[in-house]
């Protein structure tokens, strides 16, 4: 069967369902595909199909995630739904599923529960910009005032974690009712998708961001100079543009890209996703190395102290068998290199057990080009024992 051409005419947005266990995330995901499939904009996926999510491995961590896709009149969506709470923690911290926005599912029968709060906090830590709320199971609550109270609680909770509690759309519905074809509740799904379309911003495409390329390898072309190779992470770089070499040293080095090539062909410019070699003017073989980045001047700095949200792998995932403690010194793997760092655990946390999610401060022995949202792995003796996301830069 011939593969269908991917439609690029609609902007693409990644979203996901988050919320407490059994509040109806997976049922809602199924209901969205059902309602949109009747408009020709999705393929219906039933609950069982989504719930039996295949195991994926991302940076050595086993995550169960279901991916569905659908579209509205305005956008194409990739939607991720995870069966278990631990899967969300891992998914969001490793960036396995980058979310441009989230649908927070809260059962009107229960109101906000512990994982509701945890998922909102996680969304804040990993930089999910906007959250739309779906109040589920409204068909099981007789009293509208009860639902009003739940809505107020959720708005307060969003505000507490620096989301737009006042302005966030809150849609009342019943995912099960919509799955069963009840027109009152299929209407709520359409209302939800309209809110997602309008409220969740279209992400800036990687190509439109400022240029950054992690250096993977360096070699010399006799008579021409030094070439740094790597995959452009974001932005665009043109021949004869000035860039900075950043990381592993206190100060960046300025240089000019005098040539670009990909697959042995010369390029005028390189864009996010391209694997390229960049010829650098006046740079000797030893002043650029793997683990540094090339970037647009002034856009990213090298840092040594950062706060991060970290997930410690379980023993089954190949992680440690025992906990680690304050002042633990593993290797932190950023983009293309390992740098040793020392962990400071928050007050009141004596140790981190395999399977824990914890916020910590990290002091690196060499400066690395990082910013809020940068993902990394934690390694010990060459094996991955954790994964993290930078929450803030301290120094």
Curated annotation (Swiss-Prot):
Region of interest (G4), ranges: 136-139
Membrane-crossing segments per the record: none
Annotated ranges, domain tr-type G: 10-204
Region annotated G2, chain positions: 60-64
SUPFAM superfamilies in the record: EF-Tu/eEF-1alpha/eIF2-gamma C-terminal domain (SSF50465), P-loop containing nucleoside triphosphate hydrolases (SSF52540), Translation proteins (SSF50447)
SS bonds (residue pairs): none
Similarity remark: Belongs to the TRAFAC class translation factor GTPase superfamily. Classic translation factor GTPase family. EF-Tu/EF-1A subfamily.
Listed name of the protein: Elongation factor Tu
Recorded name of the encoding gene: tuf
């Amino acid at each position: 069967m011939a593969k269908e051409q991917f439609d690029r005419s609609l902007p693409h947005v990644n979203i996901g369902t988050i919320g407490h266990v059994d509040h109806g995330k997976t049922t809602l995901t199924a209901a969205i595909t059902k309602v949109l499939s009747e408009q020709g904009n999705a393929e219906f996926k039933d609950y069982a199909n989504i719930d039996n999510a295949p195991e994926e491995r991302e940076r050595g961590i086993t995550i169960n995630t279901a991916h569905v896709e659908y579209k509205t009149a305005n956008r194409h969506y990739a939607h991720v739904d995870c069966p278990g709470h631990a899967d969300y923690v891992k998914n969001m911290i490793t960036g396995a599923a980058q979310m441009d926005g989230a649908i927070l599912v809260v059962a009107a029968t229960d109101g906000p529960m512990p994982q509701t709060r945890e998922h909102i906090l996680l969304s804040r830590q990993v930089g999910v910009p906007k959250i739309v709320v779906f109040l589920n199971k409204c068909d099981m609550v007789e009293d509208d005032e009860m639902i009003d109270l739940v809505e107020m609680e959720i708005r307060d909770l969003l505000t507490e974690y620096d989301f737009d509690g006042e302005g966030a759309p809150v849609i009342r519905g019943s995912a099960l009712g919509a799955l069963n074809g009840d027109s009152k509740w299929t209407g709520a799904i359409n209302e939800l998708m309209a809110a997602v379309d309008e409220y969740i911003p279209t992400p800036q495409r990687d190509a439109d961001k400022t240029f950054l390329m992690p250096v993977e390898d360096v070699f010399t072309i006799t008579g021409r100079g030094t070439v740094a190779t790597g995959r452009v992470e974001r932005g665009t770089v043109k021949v004869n543009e000035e860039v900075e070499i950043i990381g592993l040293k206190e100060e960046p080095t300025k240089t000019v890209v005098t040539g670009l090539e990909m697959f042995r062909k010369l390029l005028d410019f390189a864009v996010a996703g391209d694997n390229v070699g960049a010829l650098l003017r006046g740079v000797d073989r030893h002043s650029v190395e793997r683990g540094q980045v090339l970037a647009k001047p002034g856009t990213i700095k090298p840092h040594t102290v950062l706060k991060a949200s970290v997930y410690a792998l379980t023993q089954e995932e190949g992680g440690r068998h025992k906990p680690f403690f304050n002042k633990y010194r593993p290797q932190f793997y950023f983009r293309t290199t390992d740098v040793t760092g020392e962990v400071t655990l928050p007050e009141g946390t004596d140790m981190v057990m395999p399977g824990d999610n914890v916020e910590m401060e990290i002091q690196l022995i060499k400066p690395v080009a990082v910013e809020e949202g940068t993902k990394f792995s934690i390694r010990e003796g060459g094996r991955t024992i954790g994964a993290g996301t930078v929450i803030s830069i301290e120094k």
